[in-house]
Amino acid sequence: MKKISRRNFLKVSGVMAAAGALAACGGSSSSSTAASSAPAAAAGGDDKFAALGDFNLIIGHSQPEGNPRFISMEKFAEDVKAATNGHLTIEVYGNGQLGTEKEMLEQVVAGTIQGMRGGQFDFSPRLLMFTLPFLANTREQVTALLHSDLAKKVCAEAEAANGTVIVNLCDAGGYRQFSNSKHPIKAPADLKGLKMRTNGMKTIDLTFQALGATTTSIPYSDLYMGLKTGVADGQENPWVNVDGMKFYEVQKYFTEVNYQFHPDPFYINAAFWNSLPQEYQEIITQCADAMGTYNDELIDQNSNASKQVVAYAGCEIYEPTADELKAFQEAVQPVYDQCVSEGICTAEEIAEMQKIVAGA
């Protein structure tokens, strides 16, 4: 029998716990029930989808095997295939095989590939309003924001502007934490002088600048080596990403600050989408909704296990007190004003998001 490591045991345990809750396109993790909630595949050998034609989608993303995005995308592909008797197939290329997230989105817009999933907002900057620091602090609040009429409006704007359709908006990985190789971060002043990696996202840059750090942009696929060689002192990512990419090998100090979550838009080329029969569009939408729910369940169940992996690796994890968190929250308030001034959102939209959060 192949020996399983502690790290993989923690991850597999979380995946198995979540698996029982998903239906393919609606509730169960078993691919044998994949068509149960989607438009049903024909019974008795009468394949109604044959007349609709065969279609194949190439979908890219940046996360490695074991990450909730990777697992949920594989499940999505299985569900769509089962729900259409194999006439609609999905080829998923994870781990950045098709390029950086920006490059993949450019390929989607150009029609080179049919879709990508990931927190890439260069062509959809107003989605950044959901990444304002300390906007939400529970799963219920995050879900309410991403399923809100405001989110639907912003997605529709993005679709009209860049030639894509956003078929799902879920969580990219859970709440994001700070780490660095120099010293513990317990207060905003501890970030001063640190060179923190960002992915170029405006709200991350503004947050670190408000906290006194300098920033350097490094692609996600290059981040491990950038941290190892000292191109950056630190970074921010959710626990599942820290675990999956083994950043704990090149970072010593972690702070569980829960400062931000990222939407995880699933983009599909609009021209390709419009070429699909309506029945296939409905199946993709239903299976994408189930995928998003499954993804978020995996994040919630795996985040603590991933945090344990980081601790087990010998890293220091600091959990700020309520007063210490308040100091961080107060320090980043200028980020809200800057986002309004740059047209990412309006003051009224900030108030609407805060109302959604308060009611969740």
PLM region spans:
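N-terminal secretory/targeting leader peptides
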Residues: K3-I4, G14, G20-S29, A42-Q141, ...
